[in-house]
Amino acid sequence: MATEGMILTNHDHQIRVGVLTVSDSCFRNLAEDRSGINLKDLVQDPSLLGGTISAYKIVPDEIEEIKETLIDWCDEKELNLILTTGGTGFAPRDVTPEATKEVIEREAPGMALAMLMGSLNVTPLGMLSRPVCGIRGKTLIINLPGSKKGSQECFQFILPALPHAIDLLRDAIVKVKEVHDELEDLPSPPPPLSPPPTTSPHKQTEDKGVQCEEEEEEKKDSGVASTEDSSSSHITAAAIAAKIPDSIISRGVQVLPRDTASLSTTPSESPRAQATSRLSTASCPTPKVQSRCSSKENILRASHSAVDITKVARRHRMSPFPLTSMDKAFITVLEMTPVLGTEIINYRDGMGRVLAQDVYAKDNLPPFPASVKDGYAVRAADGPGDRFIIGESQAGEQPTQTVMPGQVMRVTTGAPIPCGADAVVQVEDTELIRESDDGTEELEVRILVQARPGQDIRPIGHDIKRGECVLAKGTHMGPSEIGLLATVGVTEVEVNKFPVVAVMSTGNELLNPEDDLLPGKIRDSNRSTLLATIQEHGYPTINLGIVGDNPDDLLNALNEGISRADVIITSGGVSMGEKDYLKQVLDIDLHAQIHFGRVFMKPGLPTTFATLDIDGVRKIIFALPGNPVSAVVTCNLFVVPALRKMQGILDPRPTIIKARLSCDVKLDPRPEYHRCILTWHHQEPLPWAQSTGNQMSSRLMSMRSANGLLMLPPKTEQYVELHKGEVVDVMVIGRL
């Protein structure tokens, strides 16, 4: 913390923030803390506040526990900003405002007023919120609502003023003076609570607002567009801060059912301790990075690399790529991955494809009144009694006779109902009275029950009506959808194309699996594993073989992959070895945009993701680590979701379930994806996750029979291991 009179410059530390969730249900693990986790995302977003999360905690609705945490974070941790979420309503246990009033030394009523005014323009129920904002020492404390939607909107309302407020509390004289000088230069004051001037040093926070909604309130297009009426005199959230771009998938962030109060940090950022959130796209995505554009002719013409391999002594001793959190890496992959174009296919080839058009029924189903059961078509008005049988109606035939009073017609399931009949009586509710001498015909039957009109008859169009949309655009087709296409007679459909994936392994030490081992050599397993993983999901593949650790060979192999495939996957050559040239070839020769080159995760630290735009067509490049386990884990984490998005699947994220640990598991400083086998015990709702043993990234045996990845949070001072029986999140990677 700055002392009295200290001048802070633009190079001083970031805003240190604590997020405190006040909720009995979240504290007891009966509910997920979606609002608290979402606030952490917003705080850390560089396009918004750009702060760091220095503390995060969940407490019950108890005044003393709330006060104790607030005082500790203000006086001991010396945070700049504390955001509380929850406990601000009218319920008997909503006591957050009372606890806050006992802690603060000065109130900040303007911020509470801004939140109330903004909330009232969203819903009249905003008047039921009782937020308190105030200052203790040099810490600003703000009470936000407990819902994810409400807390995010209120954060948006006060966001434009937060940086300047914190600068004032930190005695950041330089920044404070800059803002004051710019305010003095304005010709007239802005309307109340309008955004600061466009020349404000915090303009990026004005231009990037947040508008999120709960999952149940999301719009069908999965983007939440707030309507802004420029003619209105009311103060709205949009008038205070503009909405940032919609995320790729509008979904809430999940959290592990445990309170991870202390977050571990990397040299460049603070990854979330909650494991599940690593694979949930946050509501506020990172800014889009424009890929470099190249000409296909120029790219494919180059056969000699410009990478200088002679100056070995001048190679990097430390990676030039910053550590990227799993959250940010996953979001970046989905943001930069395009959805491919469409093609027309025969419906029989539609398994696993995604419809690019709505499919409508050409005919009614059934096209005639059809019997639901085997029995007799009757006139309901006749009631019970003996009836003459005038013939039969079978499936596939149209009866020509009309049922008159005192008559019935024998029918089979699915057969057309004859004229004159308006009900079906099942055979079990009848007795045969008379038959032909040879027993080949039924002549008279006794109806034992009173039938009602329409009984056991499917009317015309009962199942499907002509013109009805039977399959919507975006449907991921399986066996039932193929059958439905056949039912309605649609034999050709428009679908998104499948991405073509080219795979190669790199390394001078590699041999093909069929080769005999030579000194210093090993057989290449990565290529076989990656090809099988991609093929298991149904995507066409190209085998580019083994490529030596030579820039020219790498360039030529990449050029071949670029010319033939939509996605190129490499393994090896991305770490810090003197022969690891792949990233240099991508950058120097191909002019690809490398979006990240290191990910804060285990295994898979050197995972690299790049894009290359050639004549308006985007190529996706995944440069995966060379260790076998790292390659297959990162393929499941990054490559498979990207391929699913390319083929048009609306939610490409992997399936994540809850499971119980079968043994104690030690935590690593990095978020870890621990291989496991999921099994269900008799009458237990949750599966058990059994570790596959030694998790060394070179040990492919740890993937044997594995159908899940334990999503383990990073180690903290409070939590160094998880114990047998604890519930964890598991990403499904195989058949259950």
From Swiss-Prot:
Pfam families: MoCF_biosynth, MoeA_C, MoeA_N
Post-translational modification: Palmitoylated. Palmitoylation is stimulated by GABA type A receptors activity. Palmitoylation by ZDHHC12 regulates clustering at synapses.
Chain segments carrying region MPT Mo-transferase: 14-166
Phosphoserine, modified sites: S188, S194, S200, S262, S268, S270, S305
Lipid attachment residues per UniProt (S-palmitoyl cysteine): C212, C284
Any single GO CC term annotated in Swiss-Prot or TrEMBL for this entry: plasma membrane
Biased composition (Polar residues): 261-290
Top enzyme class: transferase
Region (MPT adenylyltransferase): 326-736
Effect of G375D: In MOCODC; patient phenotype resembling Dravet syndrome; abolishes postsynaptic clustering of GPHN; decreases cell-surface expression of GABA receptors; impairs postsynaptic currents; catalytically inactive; decreases binding affinity toward GABRA3; decreases binding affinity toward GLRB
Mechanisms controlling activity: Inhibited by copper and tungsten.
One GO-annotated biological process of the protein: response to metal ion
Substitution effect: D580A: In MOCODC; lacks molybdenum cofactor synthesis activity
Segments of skewed composition (Pro residues): 187-199
Cofactor: Mg(2+)
Catalysed reactions, semicolon-separated: molybdopterin + ATP + H(+) = adenylyl-molybdopterin + diphosphate; adenylyl-molybdopterin + molybdate = Mo-molybdopterin + AMP + H(+)
Keywords of the record: ATP-binding, Cell membrane, Cell projection, Cytoplasm, Cytoskeleton, Disease variant, Lipoprotein, Magnesium, Membrane, Metal-binding, Molybdenum, Molybdenum cofactor biosynthesis, Multifunctional enzyme, Nucleotide-binding, Palmitate, Phosphoprotein, Postsynaptic cell membrane, Synapse, Transferase
NCBIfam families recorded: Glp_gephyrin (NF045515), molyb_syn (TIGR00177)
Protein purpose: Microtubule-associated protein involved in membrane protein-cytoskeleton interactions. It is thought to anchor the inhibitory glycine receptor (GLYR) to subsynaptic microtubules. Acts as a major instructive molecule at inhibitory synapses, where it also clusters GABA type A receptors. Also has a catalytic activity and catalyzes two steps in the biosynthesis of the molybdenum cofactor. In the first step, molybdopterin is adenylated. Subsequently, molybdate is inserted into adenylated molybdopterin and AMP is released.
Similarity comment: In the N-terminal section; belongs to the MoaB/Mog family.
Name of the protein described by the UniProt record: Gephyrin
Organism from which the protein derives: Homo sapiens
